[in-house]
Amino acid sequence: MALEIKVLDYGDIELESSFLVLGRDCGRTRRVPTYGFLILGGPWPLVIDTGYRHNQIMESLGMRGLQFHENMIENQLAKYGVRMGDVRYVLHTHLHIDHAGKDELFPMNTTVIINRRELEYSVSGLMHPQYPAPDIKHLIDRLHTKDALRLEDLELTGMIELFPGCYMEAA
């Protein structure tokens, strides 16, 4: 089975440069792309990261979201003939604002897989703006729905086979 990886373009974010690297290029604006990935060729499609919720949530952090109609996750998936309900797993590299904002658009029978410690950190209140309450609250709802959220632990679980030929580690 040949797997294909497709880049999903979720739009850009304009932000003050020192947000990326503390103290570097203070006052200078940078434009940063926001990407996710779609894995095709297996028994079902997989999505890695879901982008940010909407432009307004970026504005609440003093950033400018540049997400347009074509950047919406459902439209990015449609380019490859995939609907939200076709996706079996959503995997997250981490839960920052620009990576986990669209999980709630997937049905509850799509399993979101995240690192257990990342979920703990996201609900701790540390770095609050990077973990917006609506994004994290939805994950807690998934935690209380059978098979809607799967927690992995990098120190304990190691490599996980999602289907033959497709492996992941809890980031």
Provide a role label for each language-model segment.
Residues 20-22, 61-63, 105-108, 127-129:
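Short, glycine/charged-enriched secondary-structure capping and boundary segments
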Residues 1-5, 40-45, 160-169:
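Beta-strand-turn-beta hairpins that frame and shape the catalytic cleft
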Residues 12-75, 79:
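Conserved beta-strand hairpin/beta-sheet module of binuclear metal-dependent hydrolase folds
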Residues 63-114:
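Active-site metal-binding motif and surrounding structural segment of the metallo-beta-lactamase
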Residues 68-71, 76-82, 86, 116-171:
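Metallo-beta-lactamase
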Residues 17, 57-58, 101-102, 123-124:
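Short glycine-/acidic-enriched loop or helix-start segments at secondary-structure transitions
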Residues 5, 39, 49, 87, ...:
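Divalent metal-coordination and catalytic microenvironments
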Residues 52, 97, 118:
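Short, glycine/acidic-enriched loop or turn micro-motifs at the edges of active sites
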